[in-house]
Amino acid sequence: MLPLLAVLAFAPAPLTPVVVRGFDHFYNLEYSEALAIFRKAGEANPADPQIDNHIAHAILYNAMLKAGALESELVSGSNAFLRRERMNPTAEEQASFDNAIAAGFRKAQARITANPRDAAAQDSIAVTYGLRANYNFLVRKAWLDSLKDFTASRRHAQLAVDADPGFTDTKILLGLHDYVVGSLSWSYKLLGFLAGIRGDREGGIRIVEEVSAKGLNNRNDAKILLAAIYRREKQSAKAVPLLEGLIAAFPRNYLFRLELAQMLGDLGEREKAIATIDAVADLQRRQAPGFTKIQAEKIAYLKGNLLFWFDEYDKAIPELERAVAARDRIDLNTGLAACLRLGQTLDLMNRHREAIAAYQLGVALAPDSEIAKECQRYANRQYKRNRIV
């Protein structure tokens, strides 16, 4: 569900009951409700920089949800995260995010100036840098600026742990950074090396696992991150119990259920995977709490995609066609993916003329996107699926 560069909800001291309530909304994808609570908490605690981080976090993730950028497909495949389309938050969202980030920096830096070994302040500013790194990449597509903030985030997280080794929650940043850089291609990894981040994929995973078991406030964040990492590492069996626990804790979060379906599909458990998708569709039809935000056509794409991987092309096509027909109404990433997958499915059935029409819809939807380029390539040359023996 989460991109690996995303920053999680850190706080070294136990969260107040009010903030805990805000994060219950947050993890249930109810970002407007979470934001309202965080802002009230900020009014009651105006000197706390972490609350400004919570506000920025909710604003960013709300924009990511609307853009279809929270699914773990961001971290599957060959650095698919680096190919994501640029997000376009509103001017109000951008201003609110910038204001929260500025306040977080100002308050944390004042404490660090007074006491450089203030672990809580170092932790807070590490999160602020990380949030801005995420924003620089997803919204501005400013890779170098993002890398600078990414590096600063790690540096301050290390200072927090050095000042207080008991800050287990803060270690998630170190593990996240190690895993991300350790997973990058050599060209990107070179930039990380020059910035002082060498990367350690296995070590990063171990650190995140430690936080999931021993963290104070970040256990849920670590579990979410581990589920995405395990899928990327082709260890989906490890992710299933994590997601089942998250679904029980946050039943209104439809993404956890959709991710579970994908994990089950990875494991070859076709019936369970399809049943999980169908259960989400049923909740959406009944307008169950939390399921009014997901469109039926997005669910159709995900089901069609699962059927594609199970070689059930005849069953996949109507689901994918439903998503393609709604390509202008669903999020851009899903719309593009649906056009591409429908074309590929038709190609595998030797219906290339129909496939070309699907590919052309993808090209027209976002001509400069990476997926549009892929669509154009298959329009010119029929898609052939590589089999792993």
Give a label for each model feature:
Residues I51, A121, T170, D221-A222, ...:
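TPR alpha-solenoid repeat register
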